Each structure stands twice: as structure tokens, then as C-alpha cells.
Design a protein with these regions (language model features):
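Hydrophobic transmembrane alpha-helical segments in integral membrane proteins
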Residues: 1-17
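Alpha-helical transmembrane segments
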Residues: 18-25, 83-84
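Membrane-interface helix-loop junction between the first two transmembrane segments
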Residues: 22-40
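Membrane-interface alpha-helices at helix entry/exit sites of multi-pass transporters
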Residues: 35-41, 120, 189, 212-215, ...
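Hydrophobic alpha-helical transmembrane segments of multi-pass inner membrane proteins, especially
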Residues: 64-295, 334-392, 419, 423, ...
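Long extracytoplasmic/lumenal interhelical loops at the membrane interface
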Residues: 306-343, 363-366, 370
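A juxtamembrane structural motif centered on a specific transmembrane helix
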Residues: 389-457
Length: 457
């Protein structure tokens, strides 16, 4: 009976997630009435809770552990709190962005509970704390206008944080990426990404002459080189690409972009020659089967898992994702593909793409160049991190050890990503307020002109 329920549950989750994904892009349509958009967003919200409930029915049936039901209730309350708080405190916030945040958290909770209950429990409490922190950020974005003047402070704090990790950080898989403070492991580079975007936007939003570009490039290079020195090459790549995109959009000069790509290619060749763990990952990427007993074991297990899942997956607890090393962090996408299926995994990618499109949409709508660059930079950080994660586990590119935002286990990544989404929400609200103020000004102007005409007659 349990196997039958697992099988039915699998197809139900795929159907509901495909429906949710369709609604993501339906909400982007321009010619849609406000009430229709509200119906779409409400249906999305219902789909989130149905998928969550369906998955935990299976988890409880397989584990026969009452604590799973308690944990399910706690997660459902958290998801409801996120939805309610954003609507209560920020009625002008983007419900689509909030829905996507909750959906990605839900998928993460489901898979982490299945893979490691202890990791899922820690992730839940971090998400709870992250929600509290992130709810403050939209207020700051709207009311603290001088934040654009603090760009040098952002750069100094970011560089110092990265230096501390390089000097006194913990080594994990060949890279120094975290610090232990009072028994808690923190990965500063996750937060420095946000500071870095604000720094670059602050430098380039007013002036893009050659001198300013050179100074900004030098400071950006310092960030990247510190990460390279600590052997966090995945993080260095994210910083590099983010800066390149922001620089090109700010200056609109193809020369800078092409030059940056050339420097990036040279740096990649240099990294291959300098770092042994980079060579190991390249070997595992080129021909993992030839080194399946050593360097290629992780990527081979990842590919086996994805292949085993097929289009519809094996169902929760019916696969063997725990054979993949570090599956809760870098390779959680493989576990999702194996047990929930290729269709579910593709829908997950599409939801991530819809988030990125939302970021770009907000960037294009912002009138002030500073906020435009911030939205674009944060969107690039998010999208490129998703690309590195999924590209690594599918053997599209060499593995970089980057986590899947909001889904993978990782406290610093989760908190930083929720803060990133909160900044975007703040920008969205700011744009809504700008639009309303412009409409009022236009209405006043029209009313004044009408009065002048009436006086003439």
C-alpha cells in the first residue's frame, strides 16, 4: 500500500509543480487583468502547500516517525508566515517572488528531510532566523537613501571579511571558505557578494570614465584574487562574472566585456596549472568513468542518479541519492532528479529562470541607475550560481562546489539568498511607489491644465 501511495504521490507532485511553473510565466503576461493575476498567484500558493503536504505524507509513511508530522507542521507555519508577513508589512511586494521563494524553500525542506533529518532541522531554524532578518531589508532599501554613498565601506568590509577567511578560515575540500564562531560555521563570501554588488553599483552609477572604471576594476580584482588565494574558485568565478556584466551594462562598451572575457580565459588556464584540485575536477569532468574509483566517483554517482530517475523519478525513498558524496549541499539537484524525476528537475530550473527574469524586469523598470545596477548585479549572482551548481552536477561544466540557492543545505547561503530576495523586494516596492508618485504628479498636472483651459473660456 505504501508503495502505491509513493507512486501516486510522485505523479501528483510532478503535475502540481508543472502547473506551478506554467503559472510563473503566465503571471508575466502584460495583457492580464489584476484580478486574473491575483487568481494565478493564489493558485501558486495552493500548489506550494499541496506539494509540501503530499511529500510529507510519503515521508511519514516510510519513516513511521511522528516527529516528521510535527516537523511538517512547523515548516508549514514558517511558509505561511513568510507569505503573511510580506503581504501584511509590504502590501506592494511581489507575490510572485514570494511564491518562488517559498516553493524553493519547500523543495529544499522536502529533500533535506529525506536525505538527513538533522540537516533539515538546522536548515529550518536558519530559515526562520533568515526570515526575520530579511523582513527588515525592504524598509532599509526604501528609507535609507544614502546607502549608495557607502560603497567604499562595502568594499572595505567585504575585503576584510574575505582576508580573515583566507588567513584563519577552515579548509573544506581544498578551499578555505568558512569561519567557526562559537561553534557556528559561517561562510562570509556569501554575504560579501551582496556588498560587492552595492560597491560596484555605487562606483559606476554616476561616472563611468576610464579612471573610475580602473579603480573599480582594481578593487573588484582584489576581491577575486583573495578568493583565488583561499582556493574558493567557484566564488571567485561568481564575483568575476557579476562584475563583468555590471561593468558592461553601466558603460555599454563592448571592449570592456571582451577584454574581461579574455582575462577570464587566461586566469582559467593559470588556475588549472597552479591548483591541483582544479586539475582533479577537470579530469573528473572530461572522463569521469576513467577515474570512477577516485576523482570521478562523485560525478559518476550524480550522473547515475539522474539517469536512474528518468523523466518521472523513482519516488521519495526509492532511490539511492546518499551514494553521492555531499549530496545535501553541492549535489542536491541530482537527488531531486533521481527521486522526483527529470520533469520535476526541469520545472525547478524554469522556476529559477523566472526568478532571474523577475530580477531583470525590476532592473529595467528602475529609473535610478544605482538601483538598476543593484538589481542586475544581484540577478547575475543568483542566476550564475544556479548555472554553476546545475552545470556541475550534470557534467556540463567542471564541478565548482557551489550550492543551489534556497534548496541546498547551507546556513550562510540560505541567509544570504533570502537577504538577496529581500533587497529585490525592496526595489520592487520602491518602483511601485515611484510609479504611483508619477501618476499623482501627472494627474495634478492634467487637473491644473484643465483648470487653465476653463479660465480661458
Amino acid at each position: 500500500m505504501t508503495n502505491l501511495i509513493i507512486e501516486i504521490s510522485k505523479y501528483f507532485m510532478i503535475f502540481m509543480f508543472a502547473f506551478y511553473t506554467y503559472e510563473c510565466f503566465a503571471a508575466f503576461r502584460q495583457k492580464i487583468k489584476p484580478e486574473q493575476r491575483e487568481h494565478i498567484l493564489s493558485r501558486q500558493c495552493a500548489a506550494i502547500f499541496l506539494i509540501h503536504f503530499d511529500a510529507f505524507v510519503v515521508i511519514y509513511l516510510v519513516t513511521d516517525d511522528i516527529s516528521m508530522l510535527i516537523f511538517y507542521a512547523a515548516q508549514a507555519v514558517l511558509l505561511a508566515m513568510i507569505q503573511t508577513c510580506y503581504q501584511l508589512f509590504y502590501s506592494r511586494s511581489s507575490r510572485l517572488l514570494t511564491n518562488n521563494l517559498c516553493m524553493l524553500l519547500t523543495i529544499g525542506f522536502i529533500m533535506l528531510t529525506r536525505l538527513s533529518f538533522d540537516s533539515a532541522r538546522k536548515q529550518y531554524f536558519i530559515a526562520l532566523v533568515s526570515m526575520i532578518f530579511s523582513l527588515i531589508i525592504p524598509v532599509l532599501i526604501n528609507r535609507v537613501g544614502f546607502v549608495r554613498k557607502l560603497y567604499w565601506l562595502f568594499a572595505i568590509v567585504g575585503i576584510l571579511a574575505l582576508l580573515v577567511v583566507t588567513i584563519a578560515g577552515n579548509t573544506s575540500y581544498g578551499a578555505k571558505i568558512s569561519l567557526s564562531i562559537a561553534g557556528i560555521s559561517i561562510q562570509p563570501s556569501e554575504f560579501v557578494k551582496i556588498l560587492f554588488v552595492f560597491f560596484v553599483a555605487g562606483m559606476l552609477y554616476k561616472n563611468t570614465d576610464f579612471k573610475t572604471v580602473c579603480i573599480t576594476t582594481i578593487v573588484a580584482a582584489v576581491h577575486v584574487l583573495i578568493l583565488v588565494a583561499s582556493r574558493d574558485l567557484g566564488g571567485a568565478l561568481i564575483f568575476f562574472v557579476t562584475y563583468l556584466v555590471m561593468l558592461y551594462v553601466a558603460t555599454r562598451k563592448l571592449f570592456y566585456f571582451a577584454g574581461g572575457l579574455l582575462v577570464g580565459c587566461i586566469a582559467a588556464v593559470a588556475a588549472y596549472g597552479l591548483f591541483s584540485h582544479v586539475r582533479v575536477r577537470v579530469v573528473a569532468w572530461r572522463d569521469p568513468l576513467s577515474v570512477i574509483d577516485n576523482e570521478g566517483y562523485q560525478i559518476c554517482q550524480s550522473l547515475f542518479a539522474i539517469g536512474t530517475g528518468g523523466w518521472f523519478g523513482t519516488g521519495l525513498y526509492q532511490g539511492s541519492p546518499n551514494k553521492i558524496p555531499v549530496v545535501e549541499q553541492d549535489f542536491i539537484f541530482s537527488a531531486i532528479s533521481e527521486e522526483l524525476g527529470g520533469i520535476f528537475a526541469i520545472c525547478l530550473i524554469m522556476v529559477c529562470i523566472s526568478c532571474f527574469l523577475m530580477f531583470l524586469n525590476i532592473a529595467m523598470q528602475m529609473k535610478e541607475q544605482f538601483y538598476k545596477l543593484v538589481a542586475l548585479g544581484l540577478g547575475t549572482v543568483y542566476a550564475f550560481q544556479v548555472f554553476l551548481t546545475i552545470g556541475g552536477v550534470t557534467k556540463f561544466i567542471p564541478s565548482t562546489g557551489v550550492t543551489l540557492p534556497l534548496v541546498s543545505y547551507g546556513g550562510s547561503s540560505l541567509l544570504a539568498t533570502m537577504m538577496l530576495f529581500a533587497v529585490i523586494q525592496g526595489l520592487y516596492i520602491l518602483r511601485q511607489d515611484e510609479g504611483e508618485n508619477n501618476a499623482r504628479k501627472k494627474q495634478r498636472k492634467t487637473g491644473y491644465e484643465r483648470q487653465q483651459v476653463e479660465e480661458l473660456y
